[in-house]
Amino acid sequence: MASEAPPFWWDEPDWRALALAPAAWIYGRVSGRRLIRAVPPRVSLPVLCVGNFTVGGAGKTPTAIAFARGAIARGMKPGIVSRGYGGNYSGLHLVDPGHDGARHVGDEPLLLARHAAVALSPDRVKAAEYLKSLGCDFIIMDDGFQSARLHADFSLLVVDASRGIGNGRVIPAGPLRAPLTDQMRKTDALLCIGKGNGADFVIRQAARAGRPIYHAQLRPSSSATVAGRRWLAFAGIGNPDKFYESVRQAGGEVVETHSFADHYSFEPDDIRGLVDMARRQGLGLITTAKDHVRLATMPGVPPEFLSKLAVLDVDLEFDRTDALDHILDTVVERFKSRLHG
């Protein structure tokens, strides 16, 4: 079972954040110093890093998918490097969406592998070189910003507009993976996803640092099956409220919600409980594409449950129509400068 971020991380700082401040200071010193001082190894391919400032969901997966699609549309062959959070693979592995299970490789890599080749490895350089040997000519690094284990020609940091960076404190007092000032120094651009003012502070910091700021929305891609129906919506992702809002945007009525920890491994009792709750209230069951990947590759999940389970997927849409191409151009230009500089 995956661990869940403490709810107080996303509220105003309270006594818990204060009590954990000494530990957060130590963590921040170490993580910030590693980020600033690291000289990551390079590969002879353009590398785009899609990361975020905090633990938890911000929209990295649909962002990585959008860039994979964009690269393919330009005639490129992108490959995605991932650590495979939520799985248990420790070696170098090329994800096979037809045979791999989420418990083995993680749910996000399975989703990403529907769009591009995905190589899993703690050694991101080895993963990138392997993708190059397969003919890939553009690398998308899914997360890995703070670890600094592979040089990125462009680091795009994703933030959720409604949640922002929570209480603004570093782990374990808050959700930040390193002090914001240190992270911003290594950030090339900010992508704010959704509506809301929760990210106003980090947007101001990015503007003050002279970083480009892009905006995008997550649009439901399967509204026809959702609209006009009453749902029990459930999710085991970093920000389940964002998913519930997407169901509403697609025209569905969310009567009940059930949230699980991020990357949650469902048990048979969970499935029975959801089915019983939905049946009692006459509701349909709906979940995320990421949760569906985990459920569909779990042993023992009743086929009738999967056949009746609705899935709402989302696509990333930039507010500026030229934003995605502009970022891809920048990545390639920086790579060429690095190669010939």
UniProtKB/Swiss-Prot annotation:
<keyword id="KW-0418">Kinase</keyword>
<feature type="binding site">
    <location>
        <begin position="54"/>
        <end position="61"/>
    </location>
    <ligand>
        <name>ATP</name>
    </ligand>
</feature>
<dbReference type="GO" id="GO:0009245">
    <property type="term" value="P:lipid A biosynthetic process"/>
</dbReference>
<keyword id="KW-0441">Lipid A biosynthesis</keyword>
<dbReference type="GO" id="GO:0009029">
    <property type="term" value="F:tetraacyldisaccharide 4'-kinase activity"/>
</dbReference>
<keyword id="KW-0444">Lipid biosynthesis</keyword>
<dbReference type="GO" id="GO:0005524">
    <property type="term" value="F:ATP binding"/>
</dbReference>
<comment type="similarity">
    <text>Belongs to the LpxK family.</text>
</comment>
<keyword id="KW-0067">ATP-binding</keyword>
<keyword id="KW-0808">Transferase</keyword>
<dbReference type="GO" id="GO:0005886">
    <property type="term" value="C:plasma membrane"/>
</dbReference>
<comment type="function">
    <text>Transfers the gamma-phosphate of ATP to the 4'-position of a tetraacyldisaccharide 1-phosphate intermediate (termed DS-1-P) to form tetraacyldisaccharide 1,4'-bis-phosphate (lipid IVA).</text>
</comment>
<dbReference type="InterPro" id="IPR003758">
    <property type="entry name" value="LpxK"/>
</dbReference>
<dbReference type="InterPro" id="IPR027417">
    <property type="entry name" value="P-loop_NTPase"/>
</dbReference>
<dbReference type="Pfam" id="PF02606">
    <property type="entry name" value="LpxK"/>
</dbReference>
<protein>
    <recommendedName>
        <fullName>Tetraacyldisaccharide 4'-kinase</fullName>
        <ecNumber>2.7.1.130</ecNumber>
    </recommendedName>
</protein>
<keyword id="KW-0547">Nucleotide-binding</keyword>
<dbReference type="GO" id="GO:0009244">
    <property type="term" value="P:lipopolysaccharide core region biosynthetic process"/>
</dbReference>
<keyword id="KW-0443">Lipid metabolism</keyword>
<comment type="pathway">
    <text>Glycolipid biosynthesis; lipid IV(A) biosynthesis; lipid IV(A) from (3R)-3-hydroxytetradecanoyl-[acyl-carrier-protein] and UDP-N-acetyl-alpha-D-glucosamine: step 6/6.</text>
</comment>
